[in-house]
Amino acid sequence: MKKNYLSPLALLISATLFSTIVSAEQSSTQVVDALANMDVKINVIDNQAGEHGIDCAALGADWAACNRVDITLTNGFDAIESDDWALYFHSIRQILKQDNPQFKITHVTGDLHKITPTSQFKGIKAHEKVVLPITGEYWQVNYSDFMPRWYATSGDALPRNLKSTDTQDPTQFVAPFELKNWKRVGADNNVLMTAENRYQKNTALNALSEQQMRGQILPTPLDITLQQGDVDLSKGINLHLEGLTKEELTVINEHLQQVKLKQNNQGFLVEGKIIPNQFAIDNQISGAYELVITPQKALIVGYDRVGLFYGMESLLSAVSESEKPTIATMTVKDKPRMEYRGVFLDVGRNFHSKQVVMRLIDQMSRYKLNKFHFHLTDDEGWRIEIPGLPELTEVGSQRCHDLDEQTCLLPQLGSGAENNNMGSGYFTRDDYIDILRYAKARHIEVIPEIDMPAHARSAVVSMEARYNKLKAAGDEKGAEQYRLVDPSDTSVTTSVQFYDKRSYLNPCLESSKNFVNKVVSEVMQMHEEAGVPLKTWHFGGDEAKNIRLGAGFQDKNGAIESGKGIIDKQIEDKPWAKSKACQLLIKNGDVSDFDHLSSHFAKQVSEGLQQEGVTTMQAWQDGLKDAVNAKDFATKNVRVNFWDTLYWGGFDSANDWANKGYQVVISNPDYVYFDMPYEVNPSESGYYWATRASDEQKVFSFAPDNLPQNAETSVDRDGNQFTAKSDKPWPGIYGLSGQLWSEAVRTDDQVEYMLFPRILPLAERAWHKAEWENDYQAGREYVGGKTQHVSQQNLANDWDRFATIVGVKELPRLDRAGVAYRIPVPGAKIENGVLLANLSYPGLVIEYSLGESDHWQTYSAQHPPKVNGSVKVRAKNALGTRTSRVEIVTQK
C-alpha cells in the first residue's frame, strides 16, 4: 500500500489553517478528523464502589458488584461544535451509569458502546478536557480489561480510529493503577506480585546441577534408568527409523535443528523399529515405546508409529544444551498416561494466523500432545471457508463499522472501525487442509469446533445477509434454506457476552439442521481430501442462556435481598421462549421445556454425525446437561470438556459426568485456561473470572485425576484456602486440555506469550503421573492449610527438576523454533543499598538499569551491584533477542 507523508512543518501549517476554517457548519469529515485526534485517558477510581457508597444493586449490577472509572477526553487543535457524531468504544463491562449530562452512553451490542452528545452538549473547545464519570459492572483490575481502537463517526464520513487508542498497548490510554485498585473486593487475599514479592517466591527454587540434568526428558517417562557415561553427538546422528512416513521423517529432521543436531551418515547411530508384540499387555497402548542408548547406538522400539515417533522425541529431549551436545546412556520404558492430551485455540474471538497455528502444532508434537481442539467460530467471527455459503466468510469473518451488518459484523474486542487487524480473517479451504496434513505428520488429531446453538452470532448474521440478498433477488426458497432465526421470535435475552437473541441459532428450525448438515459435510470433505478422516466433531453447546435470569439478579417486583442486582426480570426471556417453532416442539411433546432445547439439538446433531460415520461427538459439558447420560446420543463416544470452576464445586461435579458414561476431558478454567493471567499484577494480560493467576508452577501442581487434592496446593479466586471432597465414585480421567480463549489476545505474539511455557507443564501432567499425585479416594477431604495428604516436599523437588529443565533446555529450543514465549519477570529487592534479583527459571539473563536511563547492564548474583534510588530490572532470553517486561524496584 502506498503512503504519502508530510513534513512536520507542513503538518503544523495544515493544522493551523484547518483550525482557522472550522466553523459552526463543520463537515462530517472535519468532525471525524477532530474526534480522531482526541486524547483518551481512562482512570480506574474504585473497584469496590459497592463498599464505598455506590448502590450497585439499584443500578442492576450482577451480584451488586460495580466499579467507578473516569474517562477523560482531551481535544486537539479543532473545536467540536457539531452534535452529529458518535464515539464508539469497546467495554467488556456493562455500563450502568454515566454522570456527565452533556453525553449519553448507549450499549450497541456485545462489548460495543457509543458516546453521543445530548441536548445539553455545549461543544468541546480546542484543547478542552471533558470527563465522563462512569459506573460499570464488576471490576477492572488489569490493563487488558480496556480494549483499544475507539473510533469516531459523523454523518456519511468514513469512520476513523482515535489515534490515542490505536495501539496494542493499553497503558498508552489507561492511567497507572493505584495500589488500592488491584483488588476486586475487600476480602481479596491474593498477593500482588511486586518485584519484592516475586523475589521471595523465587527463592524457593533449588535448581538442578549439571550432573543432575543428565538424561532429563520432558514430559517425564514412566520408567527411566540412567547408565554411566555419555555419548558425544557433536558429529550429529545417523537416523535409521523403519516404519515412519516421509512426512514424519521430515518433522524429525526439523526437530533435530531445534536441539542443535544434524543428520549425518557418520554420526551416532539411531535405529528405530515398530514391534508391537514386544510390549506387555498393559503397555500395548498407542504411543508406547522403549528406548535404549548405549555408547554404540540408540535403539527405539515403538508399539506403533506413534510410539516410534515419541521415542525419537524423547531422545531429542534428553540431548544436553551444552556447547558440545551429549546424551546420557540410559534405558527408558514409556507410555502415555492419558489418551487425550490437548490444546484448545480460539480463533473466533480474534483471528490468528496459519503460521502461529502451525508453530503451535509443531511444539505440541515435541511434548507428545495429541489433540488440537480448533475453535473455528464464535459470536465475533466465523473463521473457515464453507463452499456454497460464501457469506460466512464474506460477512462473518470480517468486523467493521456497518450498523446493518450486511457486509461485516460490528467491531468487537478492540478491533475498531476497520477490518485490517486480527478482528478479521479466516482460513481458506486449502489452509485448513494444509493444517490437517501438517498435524497428521505430527500425530495430532484436529478436532473442529463449530459452536452452537449459542455463540453463533457470526453464523446468524451471515445467514441473515444471505437471506436478504437472495430474497431481494426473488429466490425465497433459497433464502430460507439455511436461515438460522425464527422471525416470530421476539425473546428478550442477554448472552454472557452481552448480545441479544441473534447470539443463538434457533434449534427448532429445519433450516438450522440444513445449515449444520451442510457445514459438517463440507468439513468432512476437507478431512477426506487431507487424508485425515473426521473422527471427532465438537458441537460447542456452552452458555445457551440469558444471564439476566441468573442468580446474581433479583426482580424489582419481588422481595429484595442484599448482594444482588435489582432488575425487571419479568421482561426477560429464556432463549427461544417466544419462537413459535420452539413453542410448537414443546406443545407436541418433542421437548419438555425451553431449558432442554440445547441438549435436544445436540442429540439431533449426534444422529447426523453418526450417519456420516463420525464416531465421537464432543461438547462443553453444560451443552449436554439436560441429557440423561451419554447413551442419549447417537455417536459411539460422547466426550465433554469439563469446565466447572474447581473451588465452586467442580471437584465433585466432574464425577457426575464420568459416572454417566461421558469421556471427561478436564478443562478447569482455574488451572488450565491459559487466557488467565500468569500472576496477580495489572500489567499481566488476561481475564480473571476463574482465577487471578495461573503460572507454570500452578499448572504443574495440578492433579487432574484427583480433583479434591488441589485444595491443598492452590487457592480460590480471592486467594483463600478452600475445602474439597467428593463421596462419589470416580471412573477416572479420559484426558486433559489447556485452553486459550482469545477475547484479550489480538496478535500472534500474544498467542504464544499466553500459551508458552504453560503448555509444558500441561504436557507433563497429561503424560506423566507424579509421585505426589494421590489416587482418588471417595470421602477423603482435603482442607487447604490444614490437611497434609499431599507430600509438599516431593512436589517442591519435582518442580525444581522441571523448572531447571525448562529454563536450561526447553526455552532455548523454543527460541530456535521462533516461539515468542513469555520471558519471566525478575524478582528483585534492594537491601542495604545492594540489588538482589532472581528468576523463576535458571538459564536466563537478568539485566538492570539505574534511575530513568535505559543503560542496561548484566546482573551477577555472585557480585550484586550497589545501587541508589530506583532501579529497573528485566530478563533476557538466552539468545539475547527478547526481554521480559520491565519492573521498577525502589529501596524500602
Residue map of PLM features:
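Intrinsically disordered, low-complexity Pro/Gly/Ser/Thr-rich segments with frequent PxxP/GP/PP motifs
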Residues: 100-140
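Active-site neighborhood of glycoside hydrolase catalytic domains
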Residues: 493-497, 502-637
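Acidic, contiguous N-terminal accessory segments
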Residues: 146-306, 310-336, 617-626, 822-825
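Flexible, acidic glycine-rich loops studded with aromatic residues
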Residues: 615-830
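Feature activates predominantly on carbohydrate-active enzymes
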Residues: 286-288, 292-504, 509-515, 520-536
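Short, compositionally stereotyped local motifs that mark structural "simplifiers"
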Residues: 784-892
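Short beta-strand elements of extracellular/lumenal beta-sandwich folds
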Residues: 40-80
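Short acidic, flexible loop segments centered on an aromatic residue
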Residues: 76-109, 148-150
